[in-house]
Amino acid sequence: MPAEFLQLNNLGFVMICTEDFLPNHNDCKNSGDHCDLCVQKIIENGITDVVFDLHLLVDWDARRTLESHYPDYIGEVLFSYEPEWGFEFHEALREAGWSIECALESFGEHHGPAVTWLYRLYFENFSHGFLGERERFADVARDLIAKGVRVWALGNASQEWVDCARTTCPILGEINGVSASYEYHLRKPNIMIYRDFLSKNGLSASSTVFVESDLRSLKTAQRIECASTKLFTL
């Protein structure tokens, strides 16, 4: 096994960042060779399971839910609200298992009726936020599957989000499994969600790669107990 795979963290798994995994978007978009090389390296290095962040496979944007009703500046009243008790705060709670009803009630306790109504409209038009799968990552996932590598998805999402994503993203029905934060009542980058995911699916940590969209999860793992975590380029 190559040296970079021996420099594993205390949990035994390797994380990579998408900027390293696919350093040039145009390379992947216009040439199959670049993505094939990534897949080939995964196979050569004995990786049996690749876990994509859910949001890499699903084309989602919350702002689309209000676009057909209001100009952007109206939507920003909701989406850019203050961090404490605002939109992002309550969406994080939903991703950790809160229901829509609980989120709306809590939001209404901290904001006026106009903004709360926008939040309610966001839920009513929730499915409009999805545009299908992200082609470049879905293509890589299919290449991995074709080569015999098991592919999974794990990310921060509510049950409603996952349900809608499944109806618009064929790749989610082709991979080995989809897990989301609401099931664990934990959100990335909490290290326990990775441990629980590996245990739940019976995966071997030393042969699993997590493909992340940013470095927050990696940095959190290092800060807690994973100082020897290796970030590398496939």
Residue ranges and their predicted role:
Residues P2-K29, H34-D53, A138, S158-Q159, ...:
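Asp-based, Mg2+/Mn2+-dependent phosphohydrolase catalytic module
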